[in-house]
Amino acid sequence: MADVKKQSFQDMLDYVHLYRLKNKLHRETADNDRKIRDNQKRVLLLDNLNQYINDSMTVEDIRAIIANMRDDYENRVDDYMIRNAELSKQRREIRQKMAAHKTAASEKNEK
């Protein structure tokens, strides 16, 4: 009996170890995907910048292009922040509804 419990406990530890390892690998894969996406965006940005720049441009012209691009990206960041806030609000509302359902279900079971 003790051997069965010991083996069962060892099986559980192995399962937990594998589960944590799987999650770690998932996080590393997601991190690598973000790095790939970020670097692809950088390449695209440089390609776009290269299309705008020609040999007759002055340094001031190039700086103006970069400033415009920066403003565009900052506006996008602001838009994403607003979108995240809206999503956060929706998640909070859903959590409250789920808690209300859970409370109602437990009260129903008590009766």
UniProtKB/Swiss-Prot annotation:
Residues 70-104 form a coiled coil. It comes from the Bacteria. Its main location: cytoplasm. InterPro entries: DUF496. The keyword Zinc-finger does not apply. Residues 92-111 are annotated as: Disordered. It is found in: Cytoplasm. Keywords: Coiled coil, Cytoplasm. GO terms for cellular component: cytosol. Pole-localizer protein involved in the regulation of several cellular processes. Belongs to the pole-localizer TmaR family. This is Pole-localizer protein TmaR. It comes from Actinobacillus pleuropneumoniae serotype 7 (strain AP76). The lineage of its organism: Bacteria, Pseudomonadati, Pseudomonadota, Gammaproteobacteria, Pasteurellales. The gene is tmaR.
